[in-house]
Design a protein with these regions (language model features):
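ATP-binding N-terminal substructure of ATP-dependent carboxylate-amine bond-forming enzymes
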Residues: 189, 297-304, 311-316, 320-484, ...
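Extended, domain-scale alpha-helical bundle/helix-rich regions
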Residues: 279-282, 288-295
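ATP-dependent carboxylate activation and anion-phosphoryl transfer catalytic cores
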Residues: 1-274, 279-283, 303-305, 316, ...
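Conserved A3 ("GATE") glycine/threonine-rich loop of ANL adenylate-forming enzymes
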Residues: 470-473, 515-520
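Conserved anion/nucleotide-ligand pocket segment
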Residues: 507-514
Length: 870
């Protein structure tokens, strides 16, 4: 039955074997029913239920859990009609789910820990509340704050993807914001997602042709559509009719708009203390206030404008307080280390010492494509080392899915924003020994210069050296001075300059706007038309926003160096090679370590160049350099003065914890250089990427310079074929039983695939091939059956029909180049393979390696060994 427009409510219930039952947390979706819970903004505790409605659903949840007889933790989801108080149970999860992780972070009640103990036969009354250490676990947490969970989508990375939200989950991460009122929590949350938004108001204008349609059909930008509609004068009732979002939430959002309008009527000189305080209480940042009172136009620099408001605010004595999450709504005296920062309070719940013996680690924020659990691993390892060295550890992060936001990982956890303003608030309160910015990916790295200007002690590599590596022009001139090669590039500010540059170096070229993580908005263009079209789409070329164009070298190996240095001298390093050629983003590539096919001379040169770079940049701590090698020519692509996403992988293969070593160096603890023999391994590790194309309807599953994987696996084997086979099976590829469909792109790729095709034939596989590939295989004496492209209508056999009839076990489809025409033809075959769950490989190097692996290694040959046995 369709219940569109009803509310979606969830309860988390815990029951022990003595039949004691409590509800730990109830949550409410901001969006009405019809959108997957993982795609909705979720608020805890529920805000719009009346007392009787709340208790009615609570008693039902307990009844359900008792009836099923669950011992442990259970999650009950309802659809609820506020008009008639009618309800339906949508589902019951008798396991720890995504909602339970949120519930335990939101309440501070350790659900998984309690559920495990209950499973062992303990009663609720026998367990201690591990947050407060003084009360038992047999109580229902009370919250004196509001928590708001917002999903993060990365839909713009995929060609042709469907942006509408529904019952299939497409988000890749989430954030959790804590505030004293709904307005504060939602504004914090919208900033935390990290997509360039500053809250509910004062963002870049969205271009929306049809507002009514955009309100009716939920997409990943719906909240900002509501903001625009309210600015345009839509009433709460009009928006409610279109979106079915509860009027209570809409009235709160309207309140934010009202404060914004009031600010817009002032300038910096007429801004009074009362209005400034009110704006801060309801979640406005100094940045939003500066923009609203028109400082942006005067200063021409938003950071400067924000500092002016910060100074004014401190002059008025408006500073935030630190509150703790103690599961008891402060009704019982308890000390916890789980904290958030707010302006809606009088005094802080915790005291601060001035001994400068604490170290702050900045976390990695929301999981997204390009920055995921790898950086969280780095942050947690750093916290462990800091504690072992006798410092107090402080973590700032806001992602409820991470280990770093567990309250027992560090001495103090600030569950709050990683913006300059908030980090400075916390530094002002804590006066730490130093701050670590190199273990959280790009977000902390971008803050380094701003923090340094405020004289914040940054541990490890100095901020100006970080800037020298991040700023392409400075980094490039340093390479040139030291005689180190790099792909020819130029930062250009007009179309004429771009044309001149391209005429000089020739196609293909790599085009990218400056300062990005995970290759967002990068593209390889192989002719004039593509170049013009891409520049119109992705970047408005101007004086302030130059576009970097560099020569792209085809068929070059990509090699990475992950290392740790002390005072510019390399202490430990790991050189790994990509199986795919350069042109596939390093986060999507399949990586082998130690490298299997590099010339000794190449490795020697890479070590030499890395030593030079480390010395020039005075590196202290972790860094990563990416190289391109063709024959023995070695070019530097980029250098990051922070831990990279391959750090956990190389640390585990080498059994040497790079982050532990780096943290000791940053703290100034003397370390010994690891033994040389450590770096000679007699086994191979392979890191493969996990893709989620089946969830992203209509997206083209092809790999390019823009990162699109959502996870990864690491496997060890006695040789590279065994390790590769394990890792491909781990990411859900299957070994084909009988038939393989080949369509292998340009002449170079066809030649690369020839040996693999012969091998398939020798091992009894039947080959199907499309037009050009079929002709090429036949010329080389390889039997195959010709199949037709979707564009050859009326001819048979059609590739798509064979796929639908389940006659194909694996598809190797390699686009000649990434032009739209070429992509569209192969797109239908690639998309059909994904939708019909047929293994698909779109890279010739990876396809050859995988085919070689499954032809030469049988499943019986694979040993199962523990990590320690290698």
């Amino acid at each position: 039955k369709s219940l569109k427009g009803w509310k979606e409510i969830e309860y988390e219930v815990v029951r022990d074997r003595y039949d004691n039952c409590i509800t730990v947390c109830n949550m409410e979706n901001f969006d009405p029913l019809g959108i997957h819970t993982g795609e909705s903004i979720v608020i805890a505790p529920s805000q719009t239920l009346t007392n009787s409605e709340y208790h009615k659903l609570r008693e039902l949840s307990i009844k359900i859990v008792r009836h099923i007889g669950i011992v442990g933790e259970c999650n009950v989801q309802y659809a609820f009609d506020p008009q008639s108080e009618d309800y339906r149970v949508i589902e019951v999860n008798a396991r720890l789910s995504r909602s339970s992780a949120l519930a335990s972070k939101a309440t501070g009640y350790p659900l998984a820990f309690v559920a495990a103990k209950l499973g062992m036969g303990y009663g609720l009354f026998e367990l201690k509340n591990s947050v407060t250490k003084t009360t038992s676990a047999f109580f229902e947490p009370a919250l004196d704050y509001v928590v708001c969970k917002i999903p993060r989508w990365d839909l713009s990375k995929f060609r042709g993807v469907d942006k509408e939200l529904g019952s299939s989950m497409k988000s890749v991460g989430e954030v959790m914001a804590i505030g004293r009122n709904f307005e504060e929590a939602i504004q914090k949350g919208l900033r935390m997602i990290g997509q360039g938004m500053h809250g509910f108001v004062e963002n870049k204008e969205l271009q929306i042709p049809d507002l009514d349609a955009a309100l009716r059909e939920p997409t990943d930008k719906r909240v900002f559509v509501i903001s625009k509609a309210m600015h345009k004068g839509y009433t709460v009732d009009q928006i409610h009719d279109l979106t079915k979002i509860d009027r209570w939430f809409l009235n709160k959002l309207k309140h934010i708009i009202d404060i914004d309008e009031a600010l817009k009527r002032r300038n910096i000189n007429t801004l009074d203390k009362e209005l400034l305080r009110e704006a801060k209480v309801y979640g406005f940042t100094d940045f939003q206030i500066a923009r609203a009172v028109g400082l942006e136009g005067e200063e021409q620099n938003m950071h400067k404008a924000m500092l002016i408001v910060r100074q004014l605010r401190k002059g008025f004595g408006i500073v935030p307080v630190v509150k703790q999450i103690d599961t008891l709504a402060a009704e019982y005296p308890a000390q916890t280390n789980y904290l958030y920062v707010t302006y809606a309070g009088v005094a802080s719940d915790v005291s601060f010492s001035n001994d400068r013996n604490s170290v702050i680690v900045l976390g990695s924020g929301a999981y997204r494509i390009g920055s995921s659990v790898e950086f969280d691993w780095c942050g947690v390892q750093a916290l462990n080392t800091i504690r072992k060295q006798g410092y107090r550890s402080i973590m700032i992060n806001y992602n409820p899915e991470t280990v770093s936001t567990d309250y027992d990982m560090c001495d103090r956890l600030y569950f709050d924003e990683l913006t300059f303003e908030r980090v400075m608030d916390i530094i002002d309160a804590e006066t730490p020994h130093g701050v670590i910015v190199s273990t959280g990916g790009q977000i902390p790295n971008n803050l380094a210069m701003y923090l340094d200007e405020q004289n914040v002690p940054i541990l490890g590599t100095a901020a100006k050296d970080i800037d020298n590596a991040e700023d392409r022009a400075k980094f490039s001139s340093m390479l040139t001075e030291n005689g180190i090669n790099q792909p020819e590039w130029s930062a250009l500010t007009s179309m004429d300059d771009i044309d001149k540059f391209v005429d000089r170096v020739g196609f293909p070229v790599l085009v990218r706007p400056s300062y990005v993580l995970s290759g967002a908005a990068m593209n390889i263009c192989s002719n004039k038309d593509e170049l013009t079209r891409f520049l119109q789409l992705a970047a408005n070329v101007s004086e302030d926003h130059p576009v970097v164009v560099s020569k792209f070298i085809e068929h070059a190996k990509e090699i990475e160096m992950d290392a740790v240095a002390q005072n510019g001298e390399i202490m430990a390093y790991a050189i790994s090679e990509h199986i795919e050629f350069a042109g596939v983003h390093s986060g999507d590539a399949t990586i082998q370590f130690p490298p299997q096919k590099l010339y000794v001379e190449t490795v020697r040169r890479i070590k030499r160049i890395s030593r030079q770079i480390a010395k020039q940049l005075h590196i202290n701590g972790p860094f990563n350099i990416q190289y391109m090698a063709r024959d023995n020519d070695i070019l530097v692509i980029e250098c990051n003065l922070r831990a990279s996403r391959s750090f956990p992988f190389v640390s585990k293969v080498l059994k040497l914890n790079f982050i532990d070593l780096a943290t000791k160096i940053m703290l100034g603890v003397p370390v010994e250089k690891p033994n040389k023999n450590l770096f000679d391994l007699d086994y191979v590790g392979i890191k493969a990427s996990q893709f989620s194309f089946n969830r992203l309807q209509k997206a083209d599953p092809v790999l390019g310079v823009d990162m699109s994987s959502t996870g990864e696996v690491g496997c060890l084997g006695d040789d590279s074929s065994t390790a590769l086979l394990k890792s491909m099976l781990s990411v859900g590829q299957r070994i084909p039983k009988k038939t393989v469909l080949l369509s292998t792109g340009g002449a170079k790729q066809k030649a690369e695939m020839l040996d693999a095709a012969k091998m398939l034939l020798q091992h009894g596989y039947e080959l199907y091939a499309t037009g050009g590939t079929s002709k090429y295989l036949t010329e080389n004496g390889i039997e195959n059956t010709l199949v037709y492209w979707p564009s050859d209508e009326g001819k048979a056999p059609q590739a798509l029909d064979l796929l639908h009839e389940k006659k194909i076990d694996m598809v190797v489809n390699i686009p000649k180049d990434l032009t739209p025409r070429e992509l569209t033809n192969g797109y239908k075959i690639r998309r059909a393979a994904i939708d019909l769950n047929v293994p698909l490989i779109t890279n010739s190097r990876l396809a050859s390696a995988f085919i070689t692996a499954f032809c030469n290694v049988s499943m019986d040959d694979i040993d199962i060994k523990a990590w320690g046995e290698y």
